[in-house]
């Protein structure tokens, strides 16, 4: 299955529920008027795009319809793809320009954090990079065990301490091992909780100091893993973590299991955070780099009138 087909399949639930309704609504109109835009805005909010983003999309559509003299309601879907592509375009690449580079992965329990790390390690290894994992989410024994399973599956080394160990010490040992083995990428599973923002900030700043001391000037990504099925709650979670953690991007998992695919737009617009990867299935290669144009095409597919 090709890249676009994977994303299209992963967004099927969102497309079936919301995009189907938008298509039906547009077919019911014979002209483009204010009522059409009001109905469209409501449907976008239902897709977890968020009120502000839905309003912004419709305002942009109004302006373009006027500029281009568009009168056919069925042209709106193509315009929608265009506007959404522009909206979610940004710095979606991973910046891994040094040897080693460091990826810190954070997120609350249950969002698919460990699975994401395993899939990311597999992807980077397939690209010819040597990867080493650090089990620095030491709060849960299960997190360490799950990461070991993924390390074995991806055939990459893992550095771990006992449950309850200092996460910064794990990161220190992982960096030391990476330097000794000339690894290309260090991926550390870090903070899996957000009940105390100060503790989280302290933990992450301590980890950052360890990295800065051990690998000055290294490329560093701080990725937050979010569960798409939680919709607007994912946006709220991202807002909290953004304040505490200096995020560089988002990994949005479980997109295939929800009709809330519009949350990608809310994260991008409300928080200014790029989505770097999306999870669209269970398989290792179902963690896909985010592509704005393919996402917009797959989400707002124009359908011929029945």
Regions found by a protein language model. Give the residues of each.
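Short hydrophobic/aromatic residue motifs in ordered secondary structure
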Residues: 51-53, 140, 256, 284
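Terminal, Lys/Arg-rich, intrinsically disordered segments and adjacent short helical elements
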Residues: 16, 304-305
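Compositionally biased, charge-rich terminal segments
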Residues: 1-8
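Short glycine-rich anion-binding loops that position phosphate/pyrophosphate groups of nucleotides
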Residues: 191-193
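Short beta-strand segments
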Residues: 106-107, 189, 225, 279
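Conserved catalytic-core segment of NTP-binding enzymes
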Residues: 146, 163-181, 195-304
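Primarily NTPase-proximal linker/entry elements flanking Walker-type ATP/GTP-binding cores
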Residues: 13, 17-136, 143-188
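Short acidic DE-rich linear segments
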Residues: 2, 305-306
